[in-house]
Amino acid sequence: MSGLAGAGAGGRLRVAVVGATGAVGTVMLRLLGSRAFPASEIVPFASERSVGRVLDGGLVVEPLDDETIGGFDVALFSAGATRSREWAQRFVDAGAVVVDNSSAFRRVDDVPLVVSEVNPEALDAHCGIVANPNCTTMVAMLPLKALHDAFSLASMVATSYQAAGGAGQSGIDELAAQIAPLASDVTQLCEDGATAAGKVTHAVHAATLAFNVVPLLGTLGDDGHTDEERKLRDESRKILGIPSLAVSPTCVRVPVMVGHGVAVRATFEREVDLERALSALAAFPNLVLDDLPTPLAYAGRDEVAVGRVRLDLADPRTLNFFVVGDNLLKGAALNTVQLAEALVARGLVGARASAA
């Protein structure tokens, strides 16, 4: 089996990365190296068309089959829900702990849904699979947890501004291909937008995204909400441990390559003291206060940034803020690797290696 030996000085863990050639999987591989994860071997897996491809560091993509998945301590998945449902439990049965970045297991009761800074103690109850939250939920959780601990969260209204990269590399590529044809005629953009939009095709996003805002992403349900919006509600409840949390979500796609933003109106059980709220946010790990947080400024950065923090004009128990984060890093790959690190630190993986 082709892999990278000795990744992490003194490491003894064998790590599989499933979906290694995708946008998130590529970042996972980079982070495993840059963060010196204690691995003796890292093996990339991907679709059949990528098998045999040589990645950075000389890693060679392996096929997913019962002959190749044995003997791993940790398996990091970012290959979509269908692939996760098919293969995650098989990795577990072969001895690995799986950290899954898809939606496959997030709503399963006995699968922990974890943000590394928010609820790492949930890892202790895992039965072989740990779920990574949706990238939009992830970005919002850090400030919400800090404020929940201070004032007890009761409800929230959240509007997301989600980057094209939330749809994967194909989402980025589609936006990039639309920019030049539309930018070539600014007058048409201003005076006949429908004709301008018709000059390009779209298949990934619900409408032409360049120079536009698209208030629909995900699958629309009978109640008028998309599955992306339901994820934001359901995952927030599970991660924060507030089953009755009232969430009113709206998810919007914006013409940004990487970096999600969320405007949040959070209402608490207690009256909010602004200075105490700012102190709680400033003290929270991996969260920075920024007067003007923008997705572009935080693309490629590990931190989540929160700003425009202000008391509501109508309700003293309500706080408004805007939060941004890189959807490929903290929103996906970084949290996945952080969860693997936390599993190791808590002694929850490596039994096979220890017994060897």
Give each language-model segment a name.
Residues 250-255, 293-296:
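Short, solvent-exposed loop/turn elements at beta->coil junctions and helix N-caps
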Residues 274-284:
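Short amphipathic alpha-helices in soluble, non-transmembrane regions
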Residues 1-207, 245-246, 270, 297-300, ...:
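N-terminal Rossmann-like NAD(P) cofactor-binding subdomain of oxidoreductases
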Residues 253-255, 325-330:
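Glycine-rich phosphate/pyrophosphate-binding beta-alpha loops
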